[in-house]
Amino acid sequence: LLEFIDRGAPAAPSPRPVAGVASAPAAHPAAEPWPGDRVEPWSRIRKLTADHMLMSRRVSAHVQTLFEVDYTQVARIRAGKKQEFAERGVNLTYLAFIAKAVAANLRRHPRLNAAVGADTTILRHEVNLGIAVALDWGLIVPVVKQADELSLLGLARAISDLGERARTKKLNPDEVQRGTFSITNPGVFGSLAGLPILNQPQ
């Protein structure tokens, strides 16, 4: 170090001439329709969903694990409560039980209710459950705010109300914002399991 200080830094070598700048790889070409094909333009929400999901795969590593759950007890409780809920104008679905269990456990295990910052983990104080709703024109995720504070009846009512207003395009902008954890139910399509993409920044 002392020798470097006495003599100074060595002269920088002359830069070598650059033969040429390599061009960036071309983007993957979009598919072109063939004769007889029908072309359906994307709705704005479908385009936004596609862009958001592609961004999510770049931001977060997606790792899935599956568990088998015995629903015998839940099915028994649902059968006993279904009429009572119906008399209050609420359809008691299995999804309400899942939402109740998820909300309680997110409060108990806050790291599951976290978001990824630039170089931080943000542990959310609120437990706001997004409930994915598949529509003919796209996918939307209305949010049940403060879900951990709701009873089973309250959750079932909120899920039913938000789902119906999503299908009739009557949601307010704030009802699809500030979600901390989303639930999707691929079983409605008859599948055994689904591996959804994270809805950032959840």
Each language-model region and where it sits:
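Intrinsically disordered, low-complexity glycine/proline-rich and charged
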Residues: 1-16
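C-terminal catalytic/motor cores of large multi-domain enzyme assemblies
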Residues: 13-202
